[in-house]
Amino acid sequence: MSEKGRLFTSESVTEGHPDKICDAISDSILDALLAEDPCSRVAVETLVTTGQVHVVGEVTTLAKTAFADISNTVRERILDIGYDSSDKGFDGASCGVNIGIGAQSSDIAQGVNTAHEVRVEGAADPLDAQGAGDQGLMFGYAINDTPELMPLPIALAHRLARRLTEVRKNGVLPYLRSDGKTQVTIAYEDNVPVRLDTVVISTQHAAGVDLDATLAPDIREKVLNTVIDDLSHDTLDVSSVRVLVNPTGKFVLGGPMGDAGLTGRKIIVDTYGGWARHGGGAFSGKDPSKVDRSAAYAMRWVAKNIVAAGLAERIEVQVAYAIGKAAPVGLFVETFGTEAVDPAKIEKAIGEVFDLRPGAIIRDLHLLRPIYAQTAAYGHFGRTDVELPWEQLNKVDDLKRAI
């Protein structure tokens, strides 16, 4: 295609994908610990394979009951996803659960508990007391492609993945199984989405289901058409979509029996579908003292409010931290030529309106709550099915006043 015209593709996966099972387990453990002790420090990684779950990491907590009950938390989440029988390749009630969790490193804890600003610089502000849990760079992004200010390819891929799960769980298509993937390719002209080009839907199913006679027509009618009918987009042509359903022919063997899964292997699915840059840090299983998670949420909050305020049509913001320091060491703003005001003014307004110290992010977004398991599948940003604090548009007026 020409420079003005291009195709862009994003993918999503269902909650029964092996990697997403792991994200869900890690975040369910996190939520259970935070519910009992909001100050829990948690870094939990999960691996699943045929008949087995391995949970490892570092936890410092006063949540004795939740910690002792981790094995049951694991099993309950697997069963809720839909793996409840050996006939489906995995059973949360009978799988092996191995737990190997130690305490958070005291070397890391000292920098988080007492930041460089307090230890070395003598700062007195309470929000200077909490240092970043690690070094790193985090990105936030927003674009006016959709009402939720997300890139359209990933937004549509998530809607299809959620719909796959809905029709499985509510009995519309009872022969579907938990594992599945969606992929959306959209044609753009001058950065405007103009045509839905290709949709790929791969879904695990019961044995004996005919692809051509049953599965493909059902997926088109009950999943794709339903999502497209609900899609409100002025410029997108959906009249000639190429649809590929289970292009391997069948998908009976899935879940942890088909592939091993790990926490944190779907970071592009979790964020912006490849449309924006990524700092590399995964989210699931991490408490908000880890800026990989909390600062990425904060930067989405920043970006979304900037676009909603009309300061740019799309924006990417980067923040960077040093371990043990409260104040960010870097902030970068990219508006891709869509700004309504000087980007330098936008950057200055960010500094005036948003406090990006970890303690302030946790305070302003109320992050010491058990809200994370609901983010483990279908994206952390632009969610239309759950309310998340970093999606609120509560800084629009403040930004306008600051410009």
Curated annotation (Swiss-Prot):
Region feature Flexible loop, mapped onto this chain: 104-114
Cofactor(s) required, per the database record: Mg(2+); K(+)
Pathway terms, separated by semicolons: Amino-acid biosynthesis; S-adenosyl-L-methionine biosynthesis; S-adenosyl-L-methionine from L-methionine: step 1/1
Keywords: ATP-binding, Cytoplasm, Magnesium, Metal-binding, Nucleotide-binding, One-carbon metabolism, Potassium, Transferase
Residue sites binding ATP per the record: 17, 179-181, 250-251, 259, 265-266, 282, 286
Positions that bind K(+): 45
Binding-site list for Mg(2+): 19
Cited Gene3D superfamilies: 3.30.300.10
Family recorded in the similarity comment: Belongs to the AdoMet synthase family.
Protein's name in the database: S-adenosylmethionine synthase
Gene: metK
